């Protein structure tokens, strides 16, 4: 959420940010409601002052034996007007709050301006794609052939875009989770196993609601929703708290199932493990002082890239443009892994600096030494998406006979060098 005072004093900056991010919000209505609300509050304050003044006169006039009926009538009229204004103020505040929730975060000054993914900028590339001496198979064909992926039975049990992961591939999936968590805890992240049923306030706090509500699975008749990412519970773990400056930065690594309806994703990478309604992900979240958030973002990026390098998976880093960076992001890098069957790079991690956008919505502050509470900055990054990493390992480490060579860094977890039927 943006600071209303900033919106009030910098409407042109906010208007340009809306254009750059491709978001449509009635900014003029926000400004008009803000003016009306402040006028109402000023009038109420004046009326209350007048009522206090008049109420004192009543006692004095009564002692003097004078008629106070006119003054009492005035007090009644003042009370009626205050009630009328209070009712209107609640209406104005509710509408204003709803509109403020629709305002995206402002992009950082060094974020490229662009309408969509065509405006993203590649800033780094690591590793050379493997040259195969045999026809490359997509991971879904490899998995089905070794009886490690079963989409048909998953469709029978649940529906489309779900999967059973079995046998050696299930062990490889579990190995990836353990490797990711071990890698990050060794670098100062505290492991957290978060709840995957989240209330509405938490989704508003992290910024997914109201904009992305249609992409979330909700439990009918309740205030609960399934978690779309561990970012939501990890950020809201400190909602409505004032943190001691000495504990910053806070670093958490959370592992959870992720549930997404992906309402707008029809036809986009919907085969295999790339875009499923349920998947598992390891997530990095940090709470920092504002002046340290840029450094924290690069640390998160380095962690995501470091894990891919240990897996020896070629990747590239993309700086996302304004039109493709997301609603709440101040700055965002996507890490994309090479997928041989696609003959292109596919997103495997998004690393974002949210500045104070989530902290304002969730009311997360810290107290500097000797100062007033200030909003923290929050950051998050996939570390990594497990199903997509499994797919990347399968494709990049496939053998002509359909088996999968296990990356060396995972062998202590799998206790084998090859996955086969």
Curated annotation (Swiss-Prot):
ATP binds at residues 260-262, 347-350. Its EC number is 6.1.1.11. GO terms for cellular component: cytoplasm. It is found in: Cytoplasm. One of its GO terms (molecular function) is catalytic activity, acting on a protein. L-serine binds at residues 229-231, 283, 382. PROSITE patterns: AA_TRNA_LIGASE_II. It catalyses: tRNA(Ser) + L-serine + ATP = L-seryl-tRNA(Ser) + AMP + diphosphate + H(+); tRNA(Sec) + L-serine + ATP = L-seryl-tRNA(Sec) + AMP + diphosphate + H(+). Belongs to the class-II aminoacyl-tRNA synthetase family. Type-1 seryl-tRNA synthetase subfamily. This is Serine--tRNA ligase. It comes from Symbiobacterium thermophilum (strain DSM 24528 / JCM 14929 / IAM 14863 / T). The lineage of its organism: Bacteria, Bacillati, Bacillota, Clostridia, Eubacteriales. The gene is serS.
